[in-house]
Amino acid sequence: MAVGILLVGGFGTRLKPLTEESPKPMLPVAGLPVTEHQILAAKKAGIHTLVLATSYLAEVFTPYFGDGSKWGMKILYAVEKEPLGTGGAIRNAAELLGRDEPVVIFNGDVLSRHSIANQIAFHQSNNADVTLHLIDVDDARAFGCVPTDSAGRVTAFLEKMDNPVTNSINAGCYVFSPQVIDEIPFGTVVSVERETFPALVSQGRPVFGYKEQSYWLDVGTPAALFKGSRDLIEGDYQAMPGTTIAADAQITGGTSIGARCTIGAGVHIEDCIIGDDVIIEEGAILKQSFIAHGTHVPSHTEKVATYLSKKLDLPINL
């Protein structure tokens, strides 16, 4: 068994304008918030308690996720008044957890289908202090890379370089032994990636890399968020319960449509993400656009690469 912490406090700067009115972990991907996809993965791995480490727009999480009973687990909330970095957020959230089980840390803007249960088992079999999920990418120059020895033990954390020594990169899911979290200073800005992990390796502590080449995507930009939604849908479109679609509406490109929406006659939608409770009137044409929760799109509206809400109409850089 294990417990978990979801790091969902970021400002989502790279995702603007989609994050003007919503924190990035609450943006819909294939009809569900990014965080809900992670909660489902955590549940599958046997994680019974999760702490959402929140900051920006923290008030939107509790009404949606509640106490976690909908997912058969316990969900708690730790709110940062000021951002504390990944390490500070982990240390703050861990105050709500016990110290007798591994702690799985989820990066708030990653979609992954790797086996968290296998990562936990690998961590325990190696008596590791920390075990990172690593993936191999074709071109590691845009990432910091993480070389390991033949046993999977991490030997260094290297910044971006023109000639990487390995294609293995940090995929953003960590398993901590609880006593290691207690070593992170409380109430202090700390980056586990830049400070904690390199320090552990330099001290000769057991830090391991768990490699699994399953589906993985950082959805931290608008283009990546749209891609992630398309990847999960694997078809022309997906509509959540309660949505009605006119018989002659044309919906393609892996479009995601939220719950209780109304799609009018003659509407053309291609490669869009549409929130819950949206009304799109007849003849509207929407391409590569994000239509926020509760938006009313008038008839014959034409939008391409646009963030549209009740209050905003902004271009999206895709």
Residue ranges and their predicted role:
Residues F11, G108-V110:
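Active-site metal-binding loops of divalent metal-dependent hydrolases
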Residues N126-D136:
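A short, conserved acidic/glycine-rich loop-to-beta-strand motif
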Residues Y237-Q250, T255, C261-I263, V267, ...:
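A structural motif detector for beta-strand N-caps
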